[in-house]
Curated annotation (Swiss-Prot):
1-deoxy-D-xylulose 5-phosphate binds at G168, A194, G195, A216, S217. CDD domains: ThiG (cd04728). Its EC number is 2.8.1.10. Belongs to the ThiG family. The keyword Transferase applies. Its main location: cytoplasm. This is Thiazole synthase. Signal peptide: none annotated. It is an enzyme of class 2 (transferase). The active site is at K107. It is found in: Cytoplasm.
Amino acid sequence: MLEIAGKKFDSHLIMGTGGATSQTLLEKALVASGTQLTTVAMRRFRAGNTPSTAGASNGAAGGESVFGLLNRLGIDVLPNTAGCRTAKDAILTAQLAREALGTNWVKLELIADDRTLLPDVVELVDTCEMLVANGFEVLAYTSDDPVVAKRLEDAGAAAVMPLGSPIGTGLGILNPHNIELICARASVPVLLDAGVGTTSDAALAMELGCSGVLLASAVNRCQDPVAMATAMRHAVEAGRLAAAAGRIPKRTHAQGALASSSFEGLASWDEDWAEEVL
């Protein structure tokens, strides 16, 4: 069970909508993933929509919007501040989300570099603190720096979301040691966000101690999004179960230089018998 800010989810997989080639394919992938929480950029929202009436604004002309789709599927919306570069922009975007969608949850993204989409950790902590003071539950997208993650937690973040690698790269978890450190020290959920390329990345995140995984490109930009969404669902669950089971220690050789099975009961060489036969 994934619990964030007092709300419980059966699924530990959070999906994103960016990069989907069609609304129909997005819907099938979301259902296949089993997700119960999906993030959407507020820049896709148009005035006049509500979660239940967001009919034709953001999809094809005359079609259902992504907000309407999520509402119909019973998936909670996690609005994000993608594209914001300053605290002012992020706070205004969060306020828009609260007014338009009726939620005080926000995924805080402050981008420092348009090419890499890496987060601005200098602005991030202060912005998080201001949003929390204004009644928001902040899920903060951050670097894989354990110090920054801890400062976000101290600022009141409901969850910290360190990247595995830059958004959309599919490079996986480049610094597993740091992710493991963040998880070990955090008292709020740690959600791996960005860089997942395939199922092994998602499973590893859970094995390192993450409470959940957020991904978009790995599913929405692959050759078969529905199949990959299904695979990611199982990968996250497998990683979670493996972490709970506890892996064996890593060693340079077998413990005590002995094989894992006893030699008891195995056939032995009898010299006297061998002489008679030979």
